[in-house]
């Protein structure tokens, strides 16, 4: 089975590629800069371009049966007030093209990374996180994830929008916690490694179709 991974050079996207290779998938990746590709495998086909151009997506999507999207709004640093590097509408414009091209190619399965605090989970998050979302440069990031999920909900795709809590780079394996309606109550952190593994694990599953689980670690 071949999958398209978008956002493959990011901190989570790189781990998605590694996990997909471990699980035996053939992979197409769409990247803006080939020089940022950290992997070398015969199972990875590289396409240069951007998801904000549907023609670039068309070539990269051909022959794939599923899409994993690990796009984000990049900031100058992890500080919530730091300057946005990518355009503030990057995720939603990309997702519009992904949905349109998937329809053209009759591709149905898509898994993407959203965020805890989007949609109905906004009432679940701590006050301090809600304040940061409202008054820092996290605001446009969350606005994009809100729009991304609305676009997916209106589509005919078999989508899953994961809502991870705060991401870290820990390598130690912990128990994954999957929550709906704040049950079980999420913890505050999850490793990018765990997010990447879960994204690949559910490619062939329909258990989370049209759902947005919150994921954390216990």
Regions found by a protein language model. Name each.
Residues 3-25:
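N-terminal Rossmann NAD(P)H-binding glycine-rich loop of SDR-like oxidoreductase domains
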Residues 122, 155, 171-176, 202-211:
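Glycine/proline-rich active-site loop of Rossmann-fold NAD(P)-dependent oxidoreductases
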Residues 91, 144, 162, 190-200, ...:
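Substrate-positioning beta->alpha
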Residues 149-170:
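Conserved beta-loop-beta element that borders a ligand/cofactor-binding pocket
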